């Protein structure tokens, strides 16, 4: 499972303005690993899987990793921007970073595979990668090249799809990978337990995008304004209380269900349901 509502932890720390989030009605308790597990349990599953914090629109910095660890995430997913130092040969994408809140395991995506998996060409000159078929062929060929590069070395390479990737494309890629005899498909938990490529108390990300931070601040302002209007409606426009003997006449659905008596015993404070919006 991942952080609730795909909360952007990287933007949260880049903005560094907790008050702005709270004004918009967003608290840290809403996106921690405990809340993610609670939401998963609501679906009826008794066993809770591992929780992973996925990268948002900004890079994973030491502050962002610390915030993720404080919120209960000891493993995060990163794109190729996590380590600005690119090597010629591919390597296991597992890193361990010591943060003030504890160690965080970072699973970094392999850049070329990730680019192709997201439906993008590796360069503007790669005309053969202008179609799904071309990108899929390059993806399989690239994975074979990595195997030939170091045939006797076990490496864990991470590849992710984008949030908007179509299911049909995912099915094509995974079907092709399943038929590739040189590949061994595994899970995030196995990769997280692999010997890390690097262990340190710092990170070397690409430069953060200031535009993303500005967009976050603008979105929070809009949320705060909307929340203010909704709460004003709850306190100034809606009635604070309805007498229980009025409920049956005001709620025809209760009469149809023949549970008007039960409905009458419910709290009729509109701020309760307003607060859940």
PLM features per residue range, with description:
Residues 2-40:
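Glycine-rich phosphate-binding "P-loop"
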Residues 53:
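Conserved, mostly hydrophobic/aromatic
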Residues 28-46, 58-82, 100-277:
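Catalytic grooves of carbohydrate-active enzymes
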């Amino acid at each position: 499972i991942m952080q609730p509502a795909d909360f952007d932890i990287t933007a949260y720390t880049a903005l560094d303005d907790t008050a702005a989030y709270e004004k918009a009605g967003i608290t840290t308790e809403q996106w921690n690993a405990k809340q993610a597990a609670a939401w998963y349990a609501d679906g009826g599953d008794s066993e809770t899987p591992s929780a992973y914090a996925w990268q948002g629109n900004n890079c994973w910095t030491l502050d962002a990793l610390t915030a993720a660890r404080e919120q209960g995430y000891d493993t995060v997913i990163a794109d190729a921007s996590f380590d600005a130092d690119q090597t010629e040969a591919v390597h296991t994408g597992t890193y361990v970073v010591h943060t003030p809140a504890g160690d965080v395991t970072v699973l970094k995506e392999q850049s070329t595979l990730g680019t192709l998996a997201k439906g993008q060409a590796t360069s503007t000159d790669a005309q053969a990668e202008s179609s799904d078929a071309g990108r899929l062929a390059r993806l399989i060929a690239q994975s074979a090249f990595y195997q030939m590069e170091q045939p006797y070395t076990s490496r864990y390479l991470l590849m992710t799809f984008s949030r908007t990737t179509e299911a049909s494309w995912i099915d094509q890629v995974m079907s092709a990978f399943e038929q590739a005899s040189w590949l061994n498909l595994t899970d995030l938990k196995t990769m997280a337990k692999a010997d890390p490529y690097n262990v340190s108390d710092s990170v070397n990300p690409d430069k953060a995008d200031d535009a993303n931070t500005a967009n976050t601040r603008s979105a929070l302002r809009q949320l705060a304004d909307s929340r203010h209007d909704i709460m004003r409606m709850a306190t100034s426009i809606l009635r604070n209380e309805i007498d229980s003997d009025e409920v049956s006449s005001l709620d025809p659905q209760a009469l149809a269900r023949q549970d008007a008596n039960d409905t009458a015993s419910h709290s009729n404070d509109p701020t309760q349901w307003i607060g859940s919006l």
